[in-house]
Amino acid sequence: MIQLTDAHAHIKNEKQAMERITLGIPTMACAGTPGEMQELEKFGRLQGAEKILIPACGLHPWYSDKWEPEEMFSLMEKVPVIGEIGMDSVWCDVPLDRQRKALEKQLQFACEIKKPVVLHTKGQEKEIARIISHYPNTYLVHWFSGDTGLEDYLKLDCYFSIGPDVLWNPAVQKVAEQMPGNRILIETDGMEAVD
């Protein structure tokens, strides 16, 4: 039997956490704010969660105008993975300069504490590839769905997660075909993306 792992998800409530625990689906559960991390810590105390929920946290670019990255550092020290962090010029109104500063502070901290990073790159694929080239680490580019920057990330030995849209979106299928098989992971980003 094949064991599936969800490489990136946001778990919104106890019901979603219990579904994953009951089904035995290992999940990298990401928290993008201090409040989300509190919820994730609560879910981590559910019976069976320690073998299923893999916590990750970092200041998500959508919230980089509400918190400083340093407010997440003590939380980042508690988890095995940093993320999701990055930049977004498609779904986010936070000025890119502020997003960039938050990203660079978190990348520096991730390097200092030697933890891998999950990246959010929407609309900023080339810029983020340029930035991370200065912070050698292990990176997962989450829900990678475009060909912009693919070669840059491959040169940096990054991993990629692809979402459910690979099942019906020809553009995502084309990108997935260009990725090395040993660099592709699957993700839901949360059950809302699957429903």
Named regions from a protein language model:
Residues 1-195:
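Mid-domain alpha/beta scaffold segments of enzyme catalytic cores
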